[in-house]
């Protein structure tokens, strides 16, 4: 398992806007879309490719690159929070198939940060994939990773060639939890935040990504 921390200035500039309580719903959603596109480009940079030769309009041969798996991508949208993130990912992978999972966690305040949250999955529709496909699971926030672990269990049964998680913020605990059970899964995230509060939210985080995107 590899964790790709996307802490370049442009990523962090957008993330700063998303963290800011003063950022309104429209700008928050636009920021999520922008990050989705940028994360998609970073994922594409880590896909297999071939070196090829093409002939330019000047009749000259030029060396080029063809990324192998751009037509073998399936993106899983964890509703509803991931929808703007997926919109951006689809700009990077316009030929991608898309699956959806409607998942919600039961939130309650406890005396200490929870290590597990009760997750209800009310709907799932994932297209048929082959062993040549790459599954990208999009979820902007990975706190206790309870939702992600449920979805990883379902997607891994489909036996794609590779599973990638696209997130904006992940907790240290959530990454460790995923790594222990799914060591072959790669995670792309903009920030790794240190804490989870008593309600299961990442701290400092950015609040509830679904509520901030859609109200």
UniProtKB/Swiss-Prot annotation:
Keyword Thylakoid: no
UniProt-annotated binding residues for 5-phospho-alpha-D-ribose 1-diphosphate: 80, 105, 139-147, 208
One function term, GO molecular function aspect: uracil phosphoribosyltransferase activity
Database matches in Gene3D superfamilies: 3.40.50.2020
Regulation: Allosterically activated by GTP.
EC number assigned by the record: 2.4.2.9
InterPro entries: PRibTrfase_dom, PRTase-like, Upp_A, Ura_phspho_trans
Catalyses which reaction(s): UMP + diphosphate = 5-phospho-alpha-D-ribose 1-diphosphate + uracil
HAMAP family recorded: Upp_A
NCBIfam families found in the cross-reference section: PRK00129.1, upp
Name of protein: Uracil phosphoribosyltransferase
Top-level taxonomy: Archaea, Thermoproteota, Thermoprotei, Sulfolobales, Sulfolobaceae
């Amino acid at each position: 398992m590899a964790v790709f921390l996307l802490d370049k200035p442009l990523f962090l500039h957008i993330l700063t806007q998303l963290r800011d309580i003063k950022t309104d719903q429209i700008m928050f959603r636009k920021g999520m879309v922008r990050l989705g596109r940028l994360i998609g480009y970073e994922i594409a940079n880590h896909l297999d490719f071939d070196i090829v030769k093409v002939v330019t309009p000047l009749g000259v041969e030029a060396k080029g690159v063809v990324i192998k798996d751009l037509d073998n991508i399936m993106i899983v949208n964890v509703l509803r929070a991931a929808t703007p993130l997926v919109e951006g990912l689809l700009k990077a992978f316009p030929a991608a198939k898309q699956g959806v999972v409607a998942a919600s966690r039961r939130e309650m305040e406890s005396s200490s940060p929870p290590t597990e949250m009760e997750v209800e999955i009310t709907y799932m529709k994932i297209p048929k994939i082959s062993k040549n496909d790459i599954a990208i699971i999009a979820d902007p926030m990975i706190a206790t990773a309870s939702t992600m672990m449920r979805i990883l269990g379902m997607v891994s049964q489909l036996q794609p060639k590779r599973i990638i998680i696209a997130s904006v913020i992940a907790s240290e605990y959530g990454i460790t939890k995923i790594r222990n059970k799914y060591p072959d899964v790669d995670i792309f995230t903009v920030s790794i935040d240190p804490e989870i509060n008593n309600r299961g939210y990442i701290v400092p985080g950015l609040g509830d990504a679904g509520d901030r995107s859609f109200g």
